[in-house]
Swiss-Prot record:
SUPFAM superfamilies: MetI-like. Belongs to the binding-protein-dependent transport system permease family. MalFG subfamily. Gene3D superfamilies: MetI-like. It is found in: Cell membrane. This is Protein LplB. It comes from Bacillus subtilis (strain 168). CDD domains: TM_PBP2. The keyword Membrane applies. GO terms for biological process: transmembrane transport.
Length: 318
């Protein structure tokens, strides 16, 4: 009796060491196709413009063009560091960035923890929708709303203070109030949107741990402290590293719109200084040098924060 040989199954490609790059590309071709729009966006709008940082090392003139402009090396960086305004700009930027990190970063986490305690889904969705809306409001409108509420003569808040104390507070022109106003605006506008990632992380927490903790008599605070926060610790660390990496990127529009002649001594930061020197005064190479300095500091900060996180046996960004 003749034995019929068994038919071999087709080889299954897995993501192991034996699979070739071309085989993996062919297998996942539709997934890679989905990446093309995103890759094109970053290539065209993020990577190609990076050649422009070279004008920081040139005495760039729009009339001569990029290639004919003279190379000056690090002259503009030296001019910036020797500028009397350098330490004032550095102090203002660090102060405002520190306040933003101290108050604006924890705000979404705290709000997400509070929302996580809301049990009725209808209430939770309504609250989430309400707090997401400010993110889509432009800074121009946010500053306009601030003026409506805090202007000395006609502001709603100042009228209330006047009726209670008989005095008015110059929220918008007093230099001492500039930083608190900026931080309050940032918290109001971005806190709701920032809760999305934290809520997504909270959704992955094992509910059986909460049930076991309740049976052991743990209250809400203890459950949050011993279960919730440790479960989302890696998410918090990654977001903190990213925030530290953009420590000096405070945003131009908000600060520029809130700046006036009375609070300029504390309002001038690197972002507004780059605009003033580059756009209003035409010092393109000088302003590019300032922006490049800020970017280099950001890279150092993100690598440093990631290194420290790993030193403490925490999950880093890379």
């Amino acid at each position: 009796m003749e034995t019929v040989p068994k038919k071999r199954d087709a080889p299954v490609l897995t993501a192991g060491k034996g699979i070739s790059w071309m085989a993996a590309l062919k297998r996942d071709k539709w997934l890679y196709l989905l990446l093309i729009p995103g890759l094109l966006y970053f290539l065209i709008f993020k990577y190609l413009p990076m050649w422009g940082v070279l004008i920081a090392f040139k005495d760039y003139s729009p009339y001569l063009g990029f290639w004919k402009s003279e190379w000056v090396g690090f002259d503009y960086f030296k001019d910036f560091f020797m500028n009397p305004d350098f330490f004032r700009l550095l102090r203002n930027t660090l102060m405002l960035a520190s306040l933003d990190l101290l108050f604006a970063f924890p705000a979404p986490l705290i709000l997400a923890l509070l929302l996580n305690e809301v049990r009725k889904a209808v209430y939770k969705r309504c609250i989430q929708t309400f707090i997401y809306v400010p993110h889509f409001v432009s800074w121009t409108i946010v500053v306009s709303i601030t003026f409506v509420f805090f202007t000395v003569d006609t502001g709603v808040i100042n009228k209330l203070i006047m009726s209670l104390t008989g005095e008015q507070i110059s929220f918008l022109s007093d230099a001492d109030w500039f930083r608190p106003m900026i931080v309050m605006q940032s918290i109001w506008k971005e806190t709701g949107w920032g809760t999305i990632l934290f809520l997504a992380a909270l959704a992955t927490v094992d509910q059986e741990q909460y049930e076991a903790a309740i049976m052991d008599g743990a209250g809400r605070f203890r459950r949050m402290w011993h279960i919730t926060l440790p479960a989302i610790r890696s998410t918090i660390i990654v977001l903190l590293i990213l925030r530290i990496g953009s420590f000096l990127n405070l945003g131009f529009e908000q600060v520029y719109l809130m700046t006036n002649s009375l609070n300029r001594s504390v309002a001038d930061i690197f972002d507004t200084y780059v605009y003033m020197m580059g756009i209003t005064q035409g010092a393109y190479s000088y302003s590019t040098a300032v922006g490049l300095f800020k970017s280099v500091v950001g890279i150092i900060l993100i690598f440093g924060a990631n290194y420290i996180a790993k030193k403490f046996d925490q999950e880093g960004l890379f």
